[in-house]
Curated annotation (Swiss-Prot):
Organism of derivation: Xanthomonas campestris pv. campestris (strain ATCC 33913 / DSM 3586 / NCPPB 528 / LMG 568 / P 25)
The name this protein goes by in its record: Tyrosine recombinase XerD
Taxonomy, superkingdom: Bacteria
GO biological process: cell division; chromosome segregation; DNA recombination; DNA transposition; resolution of DNA recombination intermediates
Quaternary structure note: Forms a cyclic heterotetrameric complex composed of two molecules of XerC and two molecules of XerD.
One CC-aspect GO term: Holliday junction resolvase complex
UniProt key word Acetylation: no
Gene: xerD
């Protein structure tokens, strides 16, 4: 059974009742604690809010609302989402959000039990990261029309994402001060507010310099760019605002079509996968790759070794006389 489309999910969300004030307050307290105690990124907090609002609206105040939900109610909600064709990975993330929320309720004495304790996460199929070929990457990066300020910005963004292996949330929220062109490095604040230094590479540094020298001043009309969360964004639109993840997603799809690549096979995260896969194919060390990607666990990085192994097997089958 295939996962539901974004349009189908929006339609289902519109059919649910509005959020109750008590549930909204409980959700906001949870998010405020995460931000204050763990420094969770804004995009992650937005995802948690959507997860909790979905459950709260589905329950519509039954049995004490969101904070009063029991194991049976949570099981019914997960079953409803499964029948509504939400992807297993989406349901797994929801359960992770619920575990955090009810752990806080338990800690604060709002309730005396954890209704998620005996809930099993959905089984996730093991899927290998999908990487573009190096020739496809070349075509994709060359797709923007660099004769325009927006096209030059897009070229710089694509080059940087592939050169540094950034997450899309890291790219669109990147502050201008994170770039050090003189030293050729980028300071990235990743998940859990962990910082890492990533080399830029000659190509991405070249396009960043061109963007900063010509395109960005034109887009900002040579006015000061407003700060967001206390920092001035590096990449901006014609209204001097940072791009959203959805905007960049649309740009990647559009340029994939220009490059002659099926847009359905390309995503911003695919550039990060390509970065990792191509480095391994060219002999990069797994520990070094872990540091560049900002993975807290080496096991997360090791999945790329399977992709690299597949690449070697394909080369062997294609070129060895007895392959």
């Amino acid at each position: 059974m295939s996962a539901s489309s974004p349009a189908e999910r929006r339609q289902r969300a519109q059919q649910l009742p509005p959020l109750r004030a008590e549930d909204d307050q409980a959700i906001q307290r949870f998010l405020d604690r995460l931000w204050a105690e763990q420094g969770v990124a804004r995009q992650t907090l937005d995802s948690y809010r959507r997860d909790l609002e979905g459950l709260a609206r589905w329950r519509d105040g039954a049995g004490g609302g969101l904070q009063g939900a029991d194991r049976s109610a949570l099981f019914d909600y997960l079953r409803w989402r499964t029948e509504a064709r939400y992807a297993p990975r989406s349901n797994a993330r929801l359960l992770s959000t619920l575990r955090g929320f009810y752990a806080l309720c338990l800690r604060d004495g709002v309730r005396s039990d954890d209704p998620t304790a005996l809930l099993d996460p959905p089984r996730l199929p093991r899927s290998l990261p999908k990487a573009l070929t190096e020739s496809q990457i070349d075509a994709l990066l060359a797709a923007p029309e660099i004769g325009t300020p927006l096209g030059l910005r897009d070229r710089a963004m694509l080059e940087l994402m592939y050169a540094a292996g950034l997450r899309v949330s890291e790219l669109v929220t990147l502050p201008a001060v994170a770039i050090n062109l003189r030293q050729g490095v980028l300071r990235v604040t990743g998940k859990g507010s962990k910082e890492r230094l990533v080399p830029l590479g000659e190509e991405s540094q070249h396009w960043l310099e061109r963007y900063l020298e010509t395109a960005r001043p034109t887009l900002s009309e040579r006015k000061a760019v407003p700060a967001v969360d206390g920092q001035v964004p590096l990449f901006i639109d014609a209204a001097r605002r940072p791009l959203s993840r959805q905007q960049f997603w649309g740009l990647v799809k559009r340029y994939a079509a220009v490059a002659g690549i099926d847009p359905d096979t390309v995503s911003p995260h695919g550039l990060r996968h390509s970065f990792a896969t191509h480095l391994l194919n060219h002999g990069a060390d797994l520990r070094a790759l872990q540091m560049l990607l900002g993975h807290s666990s080496l096991s997360t990085t090791q999945i790329y070794t399977l992709v690299a192994r597949q690449h070697l097997q394909t080369l062997h089958a294609r070129h060895h006389p007895r392959g």
